């Protein structure tokens, strides 16, 4: 959530910044009308509260003198009814203003390139050289399906489209990748391993920005009066650990990692990536989340992105690093780097990690704060999140980049300890 002062004091300037950087149309007329009404009702509410307090004091004094207080009591009762109505009206207006605020995306950092979509993202670096094959390259489905290692048909029978059953050595490869990533981030990068719930409440989804705007992309469960959401990423529970908390400065930065299932309805994906495991309703990811002081967030962003890069480098997977333009960034981010891994079957780079600095946007929604030793007062944290990395897409990249002419797959050196020393699949 943006600073409410921006909405109240500079709505026109804010609207122009949102339009030019995010393509977001802020209804300033509605906003200004509601804000004017809020001020009017708030002033009247405060007047009534003051009158009630003064009359209540007068009643106490009159009673002490033994005077008749019936008239005063009737007057206060009248104030009470009007005050209750005024307070209720104020709550309604505040809820409307909050609803508007919750639907406004974050403002990009000054050093984010302007652009309308992914075609205007800016490549920052490349690592590794894509392998030149002397045989016809197969995609991950052609490599895995004939052996029954990737089974979309059975998954469709069980659950429908965009699910996959993994078996045998490919299931083991998938597990090995997740374990490798966790061990790397915990052992070498200093993140605390965390096991989080896969079902969260609406407050958690609002805190990180999935609600209210992206409800159609979430899977929900309802049991009786209890409604919960399946997490689209463990960013949600990890980041919400600091919700409604004041963190001591000595504990910062908080660096957390989790390996979890993720669930996405993919409501806006249409017919994209319907083949294989590129875009699934259920997938696994190793997530990185950091909560830190504002002055450290840019350095933590660079550090987090580097941690994700190391995963790909240790696996020997060529990739490129891209700085997203204003029109391609996520709702909550002020700045985002994507890492895109080389897929030989597509002869292109595909996203495998997205690392975002959200500034104080999520922290304001969550009331996540730290105690600044310089002032002694609670101040908003900065939060960051990144994929370290998507496990299924890493598996696809390993299968395709390490394939042989006979359809077998070499196991990267970094994964062999997790595969019982196995050097080749197939």
Swiss-Prot record:
GO terms for molecular function: ATP binding; serine-tRNA ligase activity. It comes from Xanthomonas campestris pv. campestris (strain ATCC 33913 / DSM 3586 / NCPPB 528 / LMG 568 / P 25). Keywords: Aminoacyl-tRNA synthetase, ATP-binding, Cytoplasm, Ligase, Nucleotide-binding, Protein biosynthesis. One of its GO terms (cellular component) is cytoplasm. This is Serine--tRNA ligase. Its EC number is 6.1.1.11. The gene is serS. L-serine binds at residues 233-235, 287, 387. InterPro entries: aa-tRNA-synt_IIb (IPR002314), aa-tRNA-synth_II (IPR006195), aa-tRNA-synth_II/BPL/LPL (IPR045864), Ser-tRNA-ligase_type_1 (IPR002317), Ser-tRNA-synth_1_N (IPR015866), SerRS_1_N_sf (IPR042103), SerRS_core (IPR033729), tRNA-bd_arm (IPR010978). Consists of two distinct domains, a catalytic core and a N-terminal extension that is involved in tRNA binding. Homodimer. The tRNA molecule binds across the dimer. GO terms for biological process: selenocysteine biosynthetic process; seryl-tRNA aminoacylation.
């Amino acid at each position: 959530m943006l600073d409410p002062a921006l909405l109240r004091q500079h709505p026109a300037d804010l609207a122009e910044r949102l339009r030019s950087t995010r393509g977001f149309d802020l209804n300033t007329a509605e906003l200004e009308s509601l804000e004017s009404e809020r001020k009017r009702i708030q002033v009247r509410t405060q007047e009534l509260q003051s009158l009630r307090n003064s009359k209540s004091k007068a009643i106490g004094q009159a009673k002490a003198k033994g005077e008749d207080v019936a008239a005063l009591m009737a007057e206060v009762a009248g104030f009470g009814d009007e005050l209750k109505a005024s307070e209720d009206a104020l709550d309604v207006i505040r809820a409307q203003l909050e609803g508007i605020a919750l639907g406004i995306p974050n403002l990009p950092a000054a050093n984010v390139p302007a652009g309308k979509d992914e075609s205007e993202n800016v490549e920052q670096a490349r690592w590794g050289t894509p392998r030149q094959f002397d045989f016809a390259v197969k995609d991950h489905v052609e490599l895995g399906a004939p052996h029954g290692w990737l089974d979309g048909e059975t998954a469709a029978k069980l659950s429908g489209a965009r699910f996959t059953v993994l078996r045998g050595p490919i299931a083991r490869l998938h597990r090995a990748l997740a374990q490798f990533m966790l061990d790397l981030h915990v052992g070498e990068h200093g993140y605390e391993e965390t096991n989080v719930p896969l079902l969260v409440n609406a407050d958690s989804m609002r805190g990180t920005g999935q609600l209210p705007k992206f409800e159609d992309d979430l899977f929900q469960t309802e049991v009786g009066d209890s409604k919960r959401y399946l997490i689209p990423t463990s960013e949600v529970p990890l980041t919400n650990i600091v919700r409604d908390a004041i963190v001591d400065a000595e504990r910062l930065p908080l660096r957390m990692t989790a390996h979890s299932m993720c669930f996405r309805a993919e409501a806006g994906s249409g017919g994209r990536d319907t083949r294989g495991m590129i875009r699934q309703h259920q997938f696994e990811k190793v997530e990185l989340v950091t909560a830190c002081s504002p002055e450290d967030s840019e350095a933590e962003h660079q550090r987090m992105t580097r941690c994700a890069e190391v995963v790909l480098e240790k696996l020997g997977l060529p990739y490129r690093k891209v700085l997203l333009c204003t029109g391609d960034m996520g709702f909550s981010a002020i700045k985002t780097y994507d890492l895109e891994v080389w897929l030989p079957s597509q002869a292109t780079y595909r996203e495998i990690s997205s690392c975002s600095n959200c500034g104080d946007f999520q922290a304001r929604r969550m009331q996540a704060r730290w105690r600044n030793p310089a002032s002694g007062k609670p101040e908003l944290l900065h939060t960051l999140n990144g994929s370290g990395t998507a496990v299924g897409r890493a598996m696809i990249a390993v299968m395709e980049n390490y394939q042989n002419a006979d359809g077998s797959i070499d196991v990267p050196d970094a994964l062999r300890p997790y595969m019982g020393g196995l050097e080749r699949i197939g």
